[in-house]
Amino acid sequence: MQLPMLLLVSLPLLLNMFKPAEAQFPRQCATIESLRSGMCCPDYFPVFGPGSDQCGVSTGRGRCVQVTVDSRPHGPQYIHDGRDDREQWPIRFFNQTCRCNGNFSGYNCGSCRPGWTGPTCSQQINIVRRNLLDLSTEERRRFVNALHQAKVTIHPDIVIATRRREEIFGPDGNTPQFENISIYNYFVWSHYYSVRKTFLGAGQQSFERVDFSHEGPAFVTWHRYHLLQLERDMQNMLQDSTFGLPYWNFATGQNTCDICSDDLMGARSNFDVSLISQNSIFSTWRVLCESIEDYDSLGTICNSTEGGPIRRNPAGNVARPMVQRLPEPEDVPQCLEVGIFDTPPFYSNSTDSFRNTVEGYSDPSGKYDPAVRSLHNLAHLFLNGTGGQTHLSPNDPIFVLLHTFTDAVFDEWLRRYSADISTYPLENAPIGHNREYNMVPFWPPVTNNEMFVTAPENLGYSYDIEWPGPLRVTEMITIAIVTALVLVAIIFAAAACIVRAKKNRDELHQPLLTDQYQHYSDDYDGIATPSQSVV
């Protein structure tokens, strides 16, 4: 068979073999040679032997280049520069990567950018992410089954590091410390790796004021790519390029979980209120990255070992009444009125910041209040279990649905404000959160800036959701007038009741309330700062 015919026959097969790896690290690069050379530029179609088609260079897909890292200063929260493998990601592991041309993408440029498909990545595609509760019975079943399949299917391309860079070659110096991991567990592991503490050495307390995916501008961009990666992995697993992750609209204001049924994310167990019903497949799931004390004291990294079951007890935290109810429906449109993406210090105490508001450290109007947990944070805490612990939260599959809705809010904000990136800081954000920082631990490197775009036009997906538009001036005036009239009516009615009650009391010579009755104002008077939320 002549070479051109061989290429024609073999290419479709190879296209299926080389699926995208968008994280740490492609299996082909987890070798002594690659680690020592610092090069991770796998072949796409090596007709003439290994190394003959790095990044698909022979067909113009891409080329091997030096990794570009962000060297701008980060914020003051992190004080241990030089001690963490995630600094200037991914330079501690690799300094050369594939840079793909046009719509090509992936660790060897063998796949397509989000929103494109086909052998030459020339066919546009748009995935629709829908409300989980709007899915048919069959669609719900398929989604639940797909999640479970991802939980038990080894990722075809990715392996995870189980040691820090200084120990990556193993005890004998010749055994790379990487492990296989399932598709869904990789999703869990990525999140853990981004939030883990910085190990400072045996006998020293690990540094905890570091988080590459929360409490800063990258919160929305990091989680956007995190979801995009899982969605792509599941599309490949299912061989269905139209598969889209659904969302959970958690802004119901209720004290019940409307997706916690056995046909969806699992009802409450009849035998233990903190466990999932045995009628749900999710009751069989086991949690990854539980041994946080060992990681922090020994300097080890979470591996593929699973532990105990998922814990979940929605609205069950009686010690914190504020987290016993989900965000109110009006919280979302109120959040969308915050027109500045982020504000100094670009941290969890920023005020008038859309990012800090949707993340849930500010109240829905954008005002920072240390006593408040709203929107995304409140939804996590409401779950009251695995889903409420940052390093473990993706183990509960509700995480996926919670974050697709959060991403939908982010995408609507981008649409309303024309993706105004001017207030996304180039520098002085918490480490990992600068605009041009490569998000940890994704591979090939992808910056926060690349995810700060409207999804339908740039990332190939959209949300089936209707948002309430901003109120017009006439509507606001009308609401204000009606509210004022109602208040006046209430005041007159209350005054009439007081007069009538006083008259009756005088006539009967008997007080309405005894001295032992607790007045509503008693607790309020004891609050030092009444303007703060009372929990």
Swiss-Prot record:
Pathway: Pigment biosynthesis; melanin biosynthesis
Residues annotated to bind Zn(2+) A: 191, 214, 223
EC number: 1.14.18.-
Protein origin, superkingdom: Eukaryota
SUPFAM superfamilies xref list: Di-copper centre-containing domain (SSF48056)
Recorded name of the encoding gene: TYRP1
Cofactor: Cu(2+); Zn(2+)
Family designation: Belongs to the tyrosinase family.
Disulfide bond sites: 29-40, 41-64, 55-98, 100-109, 112-121, 257-260, 289-302
Signal peptide bounds: 1-23
Keywords: Copper, Disulfide bond, Glycoprotein, Melanin biosynthesis, Membrane, Metal-binding, Monooxygenase, Oxidoreductase, Signal, Transmembrane, Transmembrane helix, Zinc
Alphabetized InterPro entries for the sequence: Di-copper_centre_dom_sf, Tyrosinase/Hemocyanin, Tyrosinase_Cu-bd
GO biological process: melanin biosynthetic process; melanocyte differentiation; melanosome organization
The record's free-text note on cofactor binding: Contains bound zinc ions after heterologous expression in insect cells.
Cytoplasmic topological domain: 500-535
Location in or out of the cell: Melanosome membrane
Enzyme class, first EC level, given as a word: oxidoreductase
Spans traversing the lipid bilayer: 479-499
Membrane topology: Single-pass type I membrane protein
Protein name as catalogued: 5,6-dihydroxyindole-2-carboxylic acid oxidase
GO molecular function: metal ion binding; monooxygenase activity
Lumenal, melanosome compartment segments: 24-478
GO cellular component annotations of the record: melanosome; melanosome membrane
